[in-house]
Amino acid sequence: MTTMISVSGLSKDFVLHTQGGVRIPVFAGLDLDVHAGECVCLHGPSGAGKSTLLRSLYANYKPSAGHVRVLHDGGMVDLTSAEPWQVVEVRRRSVGYVSQFLSVIPRVPALDVVAEPARLLGADAESARDRARELLRRLNIPERLW
């Protein structure tokens, strides 16, 4: 199986600079591989670090230690040490992040929301919608919800 995301030794602490540099550990030494076609669930109580992990995988948060490698253009890119332009390219074409606080525009079909990134990359409307249909089907989202 093709590894799409490989996480090794990932740790994240938040530093409270206004309180003398107190460190709050969120997670430490996390290892995770996600392969093509897998569906992964992050499960845990509020405050366990699920959202922090996702933000670290997307390079919104800089980890305290470890590596986040994402398959991009046939090779693995380590987002913990990548140049900003590389992070933008990986986000543009290889990995996405949807916040749990997503707010969508009423009356815009989910199909169009999913197709939008392809349109922004230059795909014509119909091929973008075809790809969006394929993705929504792979996620087993009923067509009545599109």
Where would I find each of the regions flagged by the language model?
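Helix-to-loop junction immediately C-terminal to a conserved catalytic motif
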Residues: Y58
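ABC ATPase NBD coupling module
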Residues: G21, M76-G96
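Conserved ABC transporter NBD signature motif
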Residues: G66-D78
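Conserved ABC ATPase "signature" region
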Residues: D78, E126-R144
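Conserved structural motif at the start of ABC-family nucleotide-binding domains
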Residues: I5, F27-G29, V90
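The feature captures the beta-strand-to-loop junction immediately N-terminal to the Walker
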Residues: H43-P45
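Short coil-to-helix segment of the ABC ATPase nucleotide-binding domain corresponding to the Q-loop/switch region
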Residues: V108-P117
